[in-house]
Design a protein with these regions (language model features):
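Anchoring transmembrane alpha helix of integral membrane proteins
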Residues: 1-75, 327-342
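Membrane-water interface of transmembrane alpha-helices in multipass transporters/channels
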Residues: 25-32, 214-224, 253-260, 295-296, ...
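Alpha-helical transmembrane segments and their immediate interhelical loop/hinge regions
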Residues: 142-251
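Hydrophobic alpha-helical transmembrane segments of membrane transport and translocation systems
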Residues: 258, 263-342
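Juxtamembrane membrane-interface segments in integral membrane proteins
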Residues: 43-46, 50, 73-149, 161
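Short, amphipathic, aromatic/basic-enriched membrane-interface segments that mark the entry/exit
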Residues: 1-5, 118, 191-195, 227-234, ...
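Membrane interface segments of multi-pass transport proteins and intramembrane proteases
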Residues: 44-57, 163-187, 283-292
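Hydrophobic alpha-helical transmembrane segments
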Residues: 8-31, 129-167
Length: 342
């Protein structure tokens, strides 16, 4: 490299650092928008072809994303707060007492229940919760801002995506065939993860909403909450149905609480999550998306856990995307090695 090349490289690196410093606050939202655009690329293309307009296809796909992301959050933020404010405080206290008695009967947890679930700890928890609720508005505004940026970037990436791709294509240091295969691997994984996550969350939330509405609870509200909770690995919907069943025990009767608990365990956790969910994923993968990419369910599970622990809510999308991108890069490296050996 001559002096001119070094100078150009240095200017390029400085420019990248400057761009990074300017756009750093938007990198997470931009990354999520790019991944969502990759996951919905086929749908946007089909809509654009049927409507004979890229703008119309982009607008409709963005509106669908708003319906899926924004509407449930707004409903929880409005109806959820109003519903919680109407709960019976006496019943809540009875529910906590009941939980304490139940935990004390479990050998390995009884000492923890005595130390952590008592009047002093509950009072401390209420005080901390009040402080959290006081700042929840700021957090909610921040999340809404990030979601708005994701939707904004998503719209422009879909609308100008082809032009942007053609602009950066000459800079990609791999052949077009390998790049197409790598992007197909990542986008196919994102499609399966995104669509199966949305469908199973709606399905499980619908099942829980039916049972709680039968016993007089707000089925739509708790269905949405349960659907979002089901996205959390390991614990999932248990963080919803356990408090609801205990509250039903205090306000209704023991039979209602047992029915809610058994229904949540047997119908949702065992039947729906264990047996129906794989069928839904297989149907989406083979019949709807016609994807041939083999996805290890365990790898996807741990990538979602790691993604959520690092990036929070958006980790559901970022975790599998980064993992699938790594796998695609490794496959390209293996191909290069095989070519060099021959």
């Amino acid at each position: 490299m001559n002096n001119t090349s070094f100078m150009i490289l240095g200017i390029f690196i400085l420019t990248l650092l400057g761009v990074y410093s300017i756009y750093k606050p938007f990198l997470l939202s931009l990354s999520v928008a790019i991944l969502l655009a990759m996951a919905t690329y086929n749908i946007v293309n089909q809509l654009s072809q049927k409507l004979n307009s890229r703008l119309a296809g982009t607008v409709i796909s963005t509106m669908m994303l708003i319906l899926i992301l924004f509407v449930p959050m707004i409903y929880i933020a409005t109806s959820g707060v109003e519903y919680i404010s109407q709960l019976d405080n006496t019943a809540i206290t009875q529910t906590v007492d009941m939980a304490q008695k139940l935990l004390q009967k479990i050998p390995l947890i009884n000492e923890y229940a005595i130390d952590k679930i008592n009047d002093d700890q509950i009072a401390k928890f209420v005080e901390q919760s009040s402080a959290y609720l006081a700042t929840a508005g700021k957090a909610g505004i921040g999340f809404a801002k990030n979601m708005f940026l994701v939707l904004l970037f998503y719209f422009f990436i879909n609308y100008y995506g082809v032009a942007m791709f053609n602009f950066i294509k000459p800079l990609i240091p791999v052949s077009e065939e390998r790049f197409q295969r790598m992007s197909h691997e990542v986008s196919s994984t994102m499609e399966v993860v995104l669509y199966s996550t949305i469908v199973t969350a709606i399905f499980e939330g619908f099942l829980f909403g039916i049972i709680v509405s039968y016993f007089g609870f707000n089925g739509l509200l708790f269905g949405i909450i349960y659907g979002l909770a089901s996205l959390i690995p390991v614990v999932g919907g248990a963080i919803v149905w356990i408090p609801v069943s205990l509250y039903a025990w205090s306000t209704l009767d023991s039979v209602s609480a047992i029915i809610i608990a058994l229904y949540s365990i047997i119908i949702i956790s065992i039947v729906a999550d264990t047996f129906v969910k794989p069928i839904i994923i297989k149907f989406i993968k083979e019949k709807m998306l016609h994807s041939t990419v083999e996805i290890n369910a365990l790898v996807i599970f741990f990538s979602i856990v790691a993604g959520m622990s690092t990036y929070g809510f958006w980790g559901i999308i970022i975790g599998p995307a980064i993992t699938s991108f790594l796998i695609a890069i490794i496959k390209i490296g293996v191909d290069y090695k095989a070519m060099s050996d021959t």
